[in-house]
């Protein structure tokens, strides 16, 4: 192998490595979804979700609406990839409607959580959640565990 061929090989390997690193950074960039809770009346959350994939925040009302909108976002981004196909009785057409509130303020009136989703396995989510006001982070193994962590922060 000539010196020129060797240098081209090294250059190609560097390009491949940089591409892999860039994809991993972008992957991590989209894995965090910020959930801003503005109201929590009768244990029904109202607020907004933000993700770097979205141009603006998305409003939600209730736990089901929150989970469906995050799941729709995850499906659109394909990140993290689901390990199983979603099953439904009827397809849902929930649009990711932009929030009407000021998008510069990514804090909830009651609480703000950063959800880092690492996996979507066994028809659930796994990752970690950071409660900004309480300055604590906890791992969760299921959506139920995530919701219980959020509820415990909101009912303290």
Spans of model-derived segments:
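Intrinsic disorder/low-complexity detector
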Residues: 2-33, 41-43, 68-123, 156
